[in-house]
Every structure is written in C-alpha cells, then in structure tokens.
Amino acid sequence: GSRLIRTNCSFSKADEILVNRLEACINSASALAREVSNKRAVIAGRITCARADWGRDARFQFYGEQAVYLSDTWVDLIWLEQFSEYEELKLALRAVRQVSVIQTVAHLSLKKDRQSLEILDQLKELMSLGATFVGLMIDSEKSISRDQLQDLIDELGILSLILDFDLEKEAFSRISDSIH
C-alpha cells in the first residue's frame, strides 16, 4: 500500500463555486484519506497556487485558511505544490507558518532557465522560513543535471523530487542512478 496519501483540494476556474465550500472539501478529503490509510500512511494535505488575479492579501488569506482547515483535520504534513513562482511559494509558506506548526513540504516547480545556485539559495531560504522539507517538481529529464541534483542533495540533506513526465526505461535508469 501507499506510504503517503496526498489530499487534493485545488480548483479550476470552473470549480470556483467550490471555493466557498473549501473547509468541507478539505475535511472530507482528509477524513477519506485517514479512513483508507488505516493509520499506515502519512497523510499530506495539498495546497496549490491561488488564482493569479487575486490580490496578494487575498492569496495570503487563502493559503492560511487552507492551512487552518488542514491543521484541524490532523494531517501529518502540509504539502505546498505547483508553485512556479518562488515569491508566491514564499507567500504561501509564510501564511502556513503564521497559523500552523504542522511539518510542511515546499515544492518549487522548476523552470528550464533556472540556475542551480539560484535554486539552491531559494530552497535554503524556504527551509529558513519554516519548510520542514523542500523539493522540486520537474517536467523534463533535461530540467536538472545529475551534478546539480547531487549538489542540492549534498547541501540540503533531503530533497523531495516530483517527476511530472513519462519515463522511458532508459531515462528512468539514468535518473534513478543519479539519485542513488
């Protein structure tokens, strides 16, 4: 069975009406995850990027509200994911830290033009702001080299890596070898 179950309460524009029922959605997702895990998996409550057309204060409040709801449902982790803008991820992390002490994973979606030193500095800053674990979400095996990945692991100790692409056997073997 799964060792980690993430709840998913992100909404598309078509689901905007559900934002008003955010607390109920989060409570239901967390309860279902707890039930199916039978206390044998870590339950992570997922928070994704808020709508870009909302103001900064509204986005901060949105992240904080979700963190409160997730904290109330006793998730084991708060999982920040699908943030391609570093400043937005910092905003979300600050909102979470203001209302919750639950361990938090902060994932930065990697853009192809990023430099590894810049990424390393940003991930370190996220940890100094209260992220328990940091990670990258990559959409191509060419997004980060083996050496860059190893540098990040050496510096940070633990790095969560989400691969958002289909792996061919050969590509999987190369990535797997670079991690071990």
Question: Positions of the model-derived regions?
Answer:
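Domain-level signal for soluble alpha/beta catalytic cores
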Residues: 1-180
